[in-house]
Curated annotation (Swiss-Prot):
InterPro entries: Ig-like_fold, Ig_E-set, Papain-like_cys_pep_sf, Transglutaminase, Transglutaminase-like, Transglutaminase-like_sf, Transglutaminase_animal, Transglutaminase_AS. Acyltransferase activity is regulated by the binding of GTP and Ca(2+): inactivated by GTP, which stabilizes its closed structure, thereby obstructing the accessibility of substrates to the active sites. In contrast, Ca(2+) acts as a cofactor by inducing conformational change to the active open form. In absence of Ca(2+), Mg(2+) may bind Ca(2+)-binding sites, promoting GTP-binding and subsequent inhibition of the acyltransferase activity. This is Protein-glutamine gamma-glutamyltransferase 2. It is found in: Cytoplasm, Cytosol; Nucleus; Chromosome; Secreted, Extracellular space, Extracellular matrix. GTP binds at residues 476-483, 580-583. GO terms for biological process: bone development; cellular response to dopamine; cellular response to serotonin; peptide cross-linking; phospholipase C-activating G protein-coupled receptor signaling pathway; positive regulation of apoptotic process; positive regulation of GTPase activity; positive regulation of small GTPase mediated signal transduction. Predominates in mature erythrocytes. Also found in kidney and cardiac muscle. It comes from Gallus gallus. GO terms for cellular component: chromatin; cytosol; extracellular region; mitochondrion; nucleus; plasma membrane. Residues 431-441 have a biased composition (Basic and acidic residues). The gene is TGM2. Ca(2+) binds at residues 399, 401, 437, 447, 452, 539. The keyword Hydrolase applies.
C-alpha cells in the first residue's frame, strides 16, 4: 500500500493571482481574488508525489464563524479534470514530480469575505488534513454572471480600480470639485472593510444568516449604508455634525480621503470618527464598496430636497424682511452627495438593474435603521415609489416642489410656489477624465415635459394644485464677476414688469452666511427700497454690495452666502421671491513636481498658496496624501503666520510606490481660511525592466 501523501509547502501565488484578478495593489502578502474567476495554487509534497487513482485530493473552503454548506458558507469539492459550472471546483493543471499546480474557482454567486482553505489528502483508508492558508473573495465586475458585472473596461477601471476621484460641491450656479483619495487598495483598508461587515448589527444578531447573504450586493450595500454612519449606535464609522463646531474632532471640510478616516475608526476600537457631512459619508461608502469589488461612484445633487413628511413639498417660511424662519423641518440643501453602485436587482421585477442610489448620510430611518437604498435610479426616474428601497425619499430629493410662505406682520401668509428648483445638475466624475458628467437625465425627465408630468401623476403627486404662479412681476438674482474670499462683491436683483401698467413695489434684499444644508447665519448685507417704481415691459437691476468685513468673520467651512430678494406689490399685496446661493472662491493651491516621475525614485513636490485676505493667517497646516505616491498622510505645520498677499509654501519629498496615473492631493487649514483643496495629476513611469 502506498505511503500517505504529506504536504510540505503550499504557494498561494499571491502576486500572480493578484495580477490576474486586478488585486495586486492590495499587496503580495495576502491572496485576494474575484469570484467566478480561476486562481492557481502550487502544492509541494514531501517524498512521493500525487498519483491519480491512488490518492484522493479534496478541498474545503469556509467563511464566517459557523460555516454550513446549506448556507453557502462552506463547500467541499474534489480535484477533477474539468471545472464545474455554478459550484466550487478544483482542476489539476500541471504536475512535475511531487509538485502539483491546481486551479481553484468559485461560483459567480459565492459569498464574499475571508475564507479558510484546507486540503484533504487520502490514500486508501489513511487521510490527512492540511491548512493551506486564508484568502479573500471579492465581487467580480469582469465576470458576465456576477451581479455586479459591468461591460465596459474603462468604466470598470474608473468605478472599481481607481483610487482617486473628484467630488462635486459648491452651488448650482458655481459648481466646484474637490479631490478625494478613496484608497481602497491601501494597507489595512480591506481588513477594515471586512471588519465592518463582521460587527454590523445583522451579523451580531444572526451570524449564519448574515454571512449567507453576503453573495448579494443589494444586502451588502444596505449594510454598508448603515455602518458608515453611527446614528444607530452600531459602531458606525462617522459621526455627522453640521453646526460649525468641530473643535473636538476634524472639520468635515478638512478630510481629503477615506483612508485616514477608516484607519482612525479601527484605531479607536470601532468608535465613530468626528466629523462627517454628506460628501464624507458618501466617499467612505464608495471606498468600502469599491474595495469589496462593487462598481461605485459619488454623485452630487444640487438643490437637494429633504422632505420629512413625505408629501413631496418643501415648505419654507420668510418674514416680510426676507429672513427665513424655521417653522418646518423640511430643508433644501445647496447640494447633497450619495453613492451609486452598479448591480442587478433579481429581487425586483425586470427593468431595475444598473445604477442604484445608496445614501449613508443619516437623514431618515429605513426599516428602523439609518440607511437608504439601494434605490434603482430607473425607479426614481419613473416614479415607481413602491419599489425597494426608499424610492419616495430619493424621488423627493430630486423632484419636490418648493413653496415659500411670506409671513406678514398680521400673521397672514402669502404663497409663492417654485416647481423647478429642486434636483439640478446631478453630477459625477467622468470616466477616465477630470471633468464633470451631468447625469440629471438618468434621474428625471426634462422639466415641464409631458413625460415628467406623467411620472408625477404615477407618484400620486397632484402637481396641478401647486402650479407655478404666473406673476406679472419676475425677479432673478445675478452675481458680479468673482466672489473671491477676502474681497467685496456685488449681487444684483433683476426685476421685470411684464404687464401693461406701472407697478409700485417694495424690494428687500438680504444676504446671510450659510451652510450647504440650508442653515443660515448672521446677516452680511441688507437693502430695503420702500418705493420702487417698475415701468411696464421694462427690466431694471438693483445692486447689493457685500463686504468682506461683514461676511468674513461668519463665513462657514462651506463658503456660502444666501441672498434672498423679496418683492411686494403695494396694490395687490402679492410677493415674488428669488433666492441665490453665492459660493465664495478660495485661492488656488499651486503644486509643482520636481524630478523625473518614476516608480521607487525620489520626487519633490513644491506647494504654494497666496493669502488673499487683508489679515495674517495663523496656525497654517498643509495635509498631503495620494494613493500609490505617499506613505499615508504628510502634515506640515508652518511656524510663522502668513501675512496678507504673502505665500504659504513648503517642499515635500516622496517616493512613488506604484506606476500609472495618480493624484497628489493637498488640503490647507488655518484660523481664517479653511478647507482649501488642490491636486496635481502625476504620471509615474514603471521601473525599467
Amino acid at each position: 500500500m502506498a505511503e500517505e501523501l504529506v504536504l510540505e509547502t503550499c504557494d498561494l501565488q499571491c502576486e500572480r493571482n493578484g495580477r490576474e484578478h486586478r488585486t495586486e495593489e492590495m499587496g503580495s502578502q495576502q491572496l485576494v481574488v474575484r469570484r467566478g474567476q480561476p486562481f492557481t495554487i502550487t502544492l509541494n509534497f514531501a517524498g512521493r508525489g500525487y498519483e491519480e487513482g491512488v490518492d484522493k485530493l479534496a478541498f474545503d473552503v469556509e467563511t464566517g464563524p459557523c460555516p454550513v454548506e446549506t448556507s453557502g458558507t462552506r463547500s467541499h469539492f474534489t480535484l477533477t479534470d474539468c471545472p464545474e459550472e455554478g459550484t466550487w471546483s478544483a482542476v489539476l493543471q500541471q504536475q512535475d514530480g511531487a509538485t502539483l499546480c491546481v486551479s481553484l474557482c468559485s461560483p459567480s454567486i459565492a459569498r464574499v469575505g475571508r475564507y479558510r482553505l484546507t486540503l484533504e489528502a487520502s490514500t486508501g483508508y489513511q487521510g490527512s488534513s492540511f491548512h493551506l492558508g486564508d484568502f479573500v473573495l471579492l465581487f467580480n465586475a469582469w465576470h458576465p454572471e456576477d451581479a455586479v458585472y459591468l461591460k465596459e473596461e474603462d468604466e470598470r477601471r474608473e468605478y472599481v480600480l481607481s483610487q482617486q476621484g473628484l467630488i462635486y460641491m459648491g452651488s448650482r450656479d458655481y459648481i466646484t470639485s474637490t479631490p478625494w483619495n478613496f484608497g481602497q487598495f491601501e494597507d489595512e483598508i480591506l481588513a477594515i472593510c471586512l471588519e465592518m461587515l463582521d460587527i454590523n448589527p445583522k451579523f451580531l444578531r444572526d451570524q449564519n444568516l448574515d454571512c449567507s447573504r453576503r453573495n448579494d450586493p443589494v444586502y451588502i450595500g444596505r449594510v454598508v449604508s448603515a455602518m458608515v454612519n453611527c446614528n444607530d449606535e452600531d459602531h458606525g464609522v462617522l459621526l455627522g455634525r453640521w453646526d460649525n463646531h468641530y473643535e473636538d474632532g476634524m472639520s468635515p471640510m478638512a478630510w481629503i480621503g477615506s483612508v485616514d478616516i477608516l484607519k482612525r475608526w479601527r484605531r479607536l476600537g470601532c468608535q465613530p470618527v468626528k466629523y462627517g457631512q454628506c460628501w464624507v459619508f458618501a466617499a467612505v461608502a464608495c471606498t468600502v464598496m469599491r474595495c469589496l469589488g462593487v462598481p461605485s461612484r459619488v454623485v452630487t445633487n444640487y438643490n437637494s430636497a429633504h422632505d420629512t413628511n413625505g408629501n413631496l413639498v418643501i415648505d419654507r417660511y420668510l418674514s416680510e424682511t426676507g429672513m427665513e424662519e424655521r417653522r418646518s423641518t423640511d430643508m433644501i440643501w445647496n447640494f447633497h452627495c450619495w453613492v451609486e453602485c452598479w448591480m442587478t436587482r433579481p429581487d425586483l421585477a425586470p427593468g431595475y438593474d444598473g445604477w442604484q442610489a445608496l445614501d449613508p448620510t443619516p437623514q431618515e430611518k429605513s426599516e428602523g435603521v439609518y440607511c437608504c437604498g439601494p434605490a434603482p435610479v430607473k425607479a426614481i426616474k419613473e416614479g415607481d415609489l413602491q419599489v425597494q428601497y426608499d424610492i419616495p425619499f430619493v424621488f423627493a430629493e430630486v423632484n419636490a416642489d418648493v413653496v415659500y410662505w411670506i409671513v406678514q406682520s398680521d400673521g397672514e401668509k402669502k404663497k409663492s410656489t417654485h416647481s423647478s428648483v429642486v434636483g439640478k445638475n446631478i453630477s459625477t466624475k467622468s470616466v477616465g477624465r477630470d471633468s464633470r458628467e451631468d447625469i440629471t437625465h438618468t434621474y428625471k425627465y426634462p422639466e415641464g415635459s409631458e413625460k415628467e408630468r406623467e411620472v408625477f401623476s404615477k407618484a400620486e403627486h397632484e402637481k396641478s394644485s401647486l402650479g407655478e404662479q404666473e406673476e406679472g412681476l419676475h425677479m432673478r438674482i445675478k452675481l458680479s464677476e468673482g466672489a473671491n474670499n477676502g474681497s467685496d462683491f456685488d449681487v444684483f436683483a433683476f426685476i421685470s414688469n411684464d404687464t401693461d401698467k406701472e407697478r409700485e413695489c417694495r424690494l428687500r434684499l438680504c444676504a446671510r452666511t450659510a451652510s450647504y444644508n440650508g442653515e443660515v447665519g448672521p446677516q452680511c448685507g441688507f437693502k430695503d427700497l420702500l418705493n420702487l417704481s417698475l415701468q411696464p415691459h421694462m427690466e431694471q437691476s438693483v445692486p447689493l454690495r457685500i463686504l468682506y468685513e461683514q461676511y468674513g468673520p461668519n463665513l462657514t467651512q462651506d463658503n456660502m452666502i444666501k441672498v434672498v430678494a423679496l418683492l411686494t406689490e403695494y396694490e395687490t399685496g402679492d410677493s415674488v421671491v428669488a433666492i441665490r446661493d453665492v459660493y465664495i472662491q478660495n485661492p488656488e493651491i499651486k503644486i509643482r513636481i520636481l524630478g523625473e516621475p518614476m516608480q521607487e525614485r525620489k520626487l519633490v513636490a513644491e506647494i504654494r498658496l497666496v493669502n488673499p485676505l487683508a489679515e495674517p493667517l495663523n496656525n497654517c497646516i498643509f495635509v498631503v496624501e495620494g494613493a500609490g505616491l505617499t506613505e499615508g498622510q504628510r502634515i506640515e505645520e508652518l511656524e510663522d503666520p502668513v501675512e496678507p498677499q504673502a505665500e504659504a509654501k513648503f517642499r515635500m519629498e516622496f517616493v512613488p510606490r506604484q506606476a500609472g496615473l495618480h493624484k497628489l492631493m493637498v488640503d490647507f487649514e488655518s484660523d481664517k481660511l479653511t478647507g482649501v483643496k488642490g491636486y496635481r495629476n502625476v504620471i509615474i513611469a514603471p521601473l525599467p525592466k
